[in-house]
Amino acid sequence: SLSFYKPILYKREKQKKHYGNDSRIIGWQLDNEPAVQFDYNPKAELAFRDFLREKYHHDIKALNDAWGTAFWSEVYSSFDEITLPKTAQMFMNHHQILDYRRFAASQTNDFLNEQCLLIKKYAKNQWVTTNYIPNYEEGHIGGSPALDFQSYTRYMVYGDNEGIGRRGYRVGNPLRIAFANDFFRPIQGTYGVMELQPGQVNWGSINPQPLPGAVRLWMWSVFAGG
């Protein structure tokens, strides 16, 4: 929510002033598994309109053409007429939904960038990253260029699939790490894994115990990916 934006940055600044030159700290992980959160309050609606004005260069005709609003008489005469895509009697304009998702992703990216730049203001020798969940359909991953490198989170066995092989239920599917490596490596070259399952979890409906040596195997798979 935009309502929390400034208070969080204020607290971040106080924190970085205190720890920015602490030699015991080598780097920072921003938040935990940042994701795109859909916000429908009035401030978000105003910000969405500003996002559209910038994207379409203040040309409402360009937006109408891109969204295909001539169909079903959706034509807008002003950006101020545009609302957030909430619900409709039959269906929503898919172009509007796509732009809203892009807007929400940009809000997440901007927030990460702001935090990162704030850290670097006081911590010249400390790197900054964050740990994304490798959801390949998400549009915000890799969209914060201020980060020094991108990182991901990976849980391999929590009862959601049988894995591969006779012991796969306790070792997992190696493609989960391989795909994540290949997804994150091209963004900046260097990538990290800030959260890798060390044992049983407390949130799985079925909770297999990783086989002895499984965590080491996963770590080697991360290193092998570059």
Model-derived regions: residue spans:
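Surface-exposed charge patches
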Residues: 117, 182, 220
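Polysaccharide-binding and catalytic clefts of secreted carbohydrate-active enzymes
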Residues: 1-179
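A generic structural signal for short coil/turn motifs at secondary-structure boundaries
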Residues: 37-39, 202-205
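Substrate-binding cleft of secreted/luminal carbohydrate-active enzymes
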Residues: 26, 196, 206, 210-226
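Anion (oxyanion) recognition and catalysis
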Residues: 120, 185, 223-224
